[in-house]
Structures are given as C-alpha cells and as structure tokens.
C-alpha cells in the first residue's frame, strides 16, 4: 500500500505546490516573512502600476485626439445656442474647453491616493494602513492638535507651589 506524503516539513504553499524543490534567495525569504495582507498589498501595487502604465499609454494616445477636438472647438465661430442643442452637447463643449493639465490634476489626486493606500497595505504594522489618505491624515492631524490643546490647558490650570 502506498505511503501518504508527509507535509509536516513543508511550511508554505510554494513548497507544497512545488513538491520537494525549494526556492531560495532573498526575495523568497522576504515573501515568506510577510503576512497575507502585505502579500496582497504588493500584488495590488504591482497590478495597479501595470494598469497605470496601460492607462497612461491610452491617455497619451487620446491626448492627440483631445487636442484636435479642443482646437476644432476653439476655431469654430461662437454661435447662438440653437434650440436643437442638447445639454450633453453643451456639457461636452464646456468640458472640452478645460485645459488638459486641469484634467490631469483632477485624475492624479485620486490616483495617488489609491496608490498610497495600496502601498500602506504593504507595511508590517496594520495600524499604519491608510494614514497617507488625505481625509484620514487630516483627521489624525486635527486629533493630535486637539489633544495638544487639551494637554496644554490642563498644564496651565495646575498651580505651581513654590517651596
């Protein structure tokens, strides 16, 4: 009768999947020392950067089209709004008149917030996850300021006894 394999010496899923062959090196050791949240954080950062590279390529291809449409919009003679003009056409015309750098800033702030959140998930201390997100950061700063004011008020109420 065949003997059941003994998996007691195999410590992680990589060695279980790979059989008896063990991967070695500093990257593998660092990966094994991370907990699940950190591993998923690094995978999320990698996928986010990969998707970002694809999106930036697409955006810069679109940039040429955007510039062409914006120039066509500017070169047209301003006409009186017609009754047949829909609100979507009017909105599109107004949005095309915004400069490209403004669109970049509008999309860059949430992009950086998401990246910093994913990066904070890679930290070893779970209490530090999300500290770099703007609303959380502002709440922490305000809370620290209130605690400082409260402590300084308590100190000023103490009467010093001169001996």
UniProtKB/Swiss-Prot annotation:
Spans through the membrane: 40-60, 100-119
Chief location: Golgi
Localization (cell): Golgi apparatus membrane
GO annotations of cellular component type: Golgi apparatus; Golgi cisterna; Golgi membrane
Membrane topology classification: Multi-pass membrane protein
GO terms under biological process: lysosomal transport; lysosome organization; regulation of vesicle-mediated transport
One Pfam match: TMEM251
Keywords: Golgi apparatus, Membrane, Transmembrane, Transmembrane helix
Family: Belongs to the LYSET family.
Assembly and oligomerization: Interacts with GNPTAB; this interaction is important for proper localization of GNPTAB in Golgi stacks. Interacts with MBTPS1.
Functional note: Required for mannose-6-phosphate-dependent trafficking of lysosomal enzymes. LYSET bridges GlcNAc-1-phosphate transferase (GNPTAB), to the membrane-bound transcription factor site-1 protease (MBTPS1), thus allowing proteolytic activation of the GNPTAB. GNPTAB is involved in the regulation of M6P-dependent Golgi-to-lysosome trafficking of lysosomal enzymes. LYSET is thus an essential factor for maturation and delivery of lysosomal hydrolases.
Protein name: Lysosomal enzyme trafficking factor
Source organism: Rattus norvegicus
Gene: Lyset
